[in-house]
Amino acid sequence: MDNITINNRSQIVIQEDTGNQSYVAKIWLYDITADQLTEVAHHDQDRFAPGAPNFLTQDEESSGVIDASAILGEGWYLLDQQAHYATDAELVEGGQLLALHIPPGKKLQVR
């Protein structure tokens, strides 16, 4: 586990950094009250699992998650996805900025 943020519903959003391992990184939601950990997102296995058809790298992570509820509405988060592979000199490496919605008040399925 790497980066976290806490929302106003006693839940922690947790991001994984796999550290250049073949395991595809995930994003988790930990509900403090229910003591329940649920996977809410994962990186694209077609791009980050070794041997996949569109493989880029196994060195991926998401980072910098912030609760954006005050700006985008309840259940919205902003984060970045870092794909540690070489690209053109202007960009340095792959990645993107993401908006993630975790619906509030909805029972999440445990995976």
Language model: regions and residue ranges:
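Sequence/structural signature of beta-propeller domains
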Residues: 1-111
